[in-house]
């Protein structure tokens, strides 16, 4: 109990003050503007926002001027309500939408400051060099490759959402004590429900993983996930030497429910303490591994199917009692690893069984020894990626390439750069696939879509256009992967890259999931 209280007090001692004045600093909005222009890997900001770089800088300066005006947020919300429901002027709606996006990005940048400082100080205390490599998404897969081959069952978990926005704000109160900033953030979330970039239901619950989601909501959602993972990890680590009565101390964080009546808090604590006493006895599995990214998590175990069902029951009750989030049973699937493929981080992952027989000779007798080896395998989900390309209007649902009419107003070099950028990102992200044939099919769709787009711009056919410019125009769509491999591994033999389509390579510079994967 004292250990947990000391840990919580240590966290509270790092709470940050005086974030509110940063909302009136011009460089914050400049950072938000720069993030809006360069934050996407797949979609271009010109398409999303509808303005060029020069005019957007003017809009940012205009926004900074309006921030100093009294009741700016209220007038912004009122303008948005009139524009959306009465019949709006396009320019006014565009300005309101742009200003709202900039304010949302600015809130995200400000609230990330204390957490970024805490992360840097943590790695400095632990003396961990090159900690940026630990941020790579690909670093998860070698961990899975090493651990899952020894486990039996896996639970595929969809973390429940939407979450009530008041709970999200109250979670931040554990880390930030700047009351004006928190009140302004609460007002911003409540009043900003009618714009497309913030999808909030009438009950003011946030759907975090929508296509229109922005940086602020992802940060708030990650804070919510960190809160319950903090308790989950502590329970997992401390079961061996803490008595069951100590688990009631988790509920001493009643500042999370400061505005609830005292009687309700008391009943809540009693119910949850009884719940912990009933369920924590089964947390004695030394081979339990947990991996999460975005709204999905994997819980793998060497235990039995009954143990996994108990963990499932534990998650449901924990979300319900602690966060008031109701979760449906279909959000957690329990499967045996030997005959199950799960979709995670843009890959279809499975555990392959390899059977082999070895003949053993002992004196005059010989016999066969059958052995089974397990191998963690990852492949490109071609069907999912084709569906993503179809949503982005690069092909039909059956995978037939089509032109991109919205890009025909761009120059030829810009069109080639955009298609080439998408192909390079896909090759880079899916470099860990054991079978590259599916990735080559995706690149072929993008290559032909690029050719159709250029041919449509020049009012020609694809065959005529390629005959006139030559096939070398689109070679980068297929040679980029070998160039990357040649830079990483010096080509000592002429046959080094001959089998590169079978090599799996995990990079340490991929810090976010590919946007095409997010659409699938």
UniProtKB/Swiss-Prot annotation:
InterPro entries: Domain_X, Maturase_MatK, Maturase_MatK_N. GO terms for molecular function: RNA binding. One of its GO terms (cellular component) is chloroplast. GO terms for biological process: mRNA processing; RNA splicing; tRNA processing. It is found in: Plastid, Chloroplast. Its main location: plastid. Keywords: Chloroplast, mRNA processing, Plastid, RNA-binding, tRNA processing. Usually encoded in the trnK tRNA gene intron. Probably assists in splicing its own and other chloroplast group II introns. Belongs to the intron maturase 2 family. MatK subfamily. This is Maturase K. It comes from Aspidistra elatior (Cast-iron plant). The gene is matK.
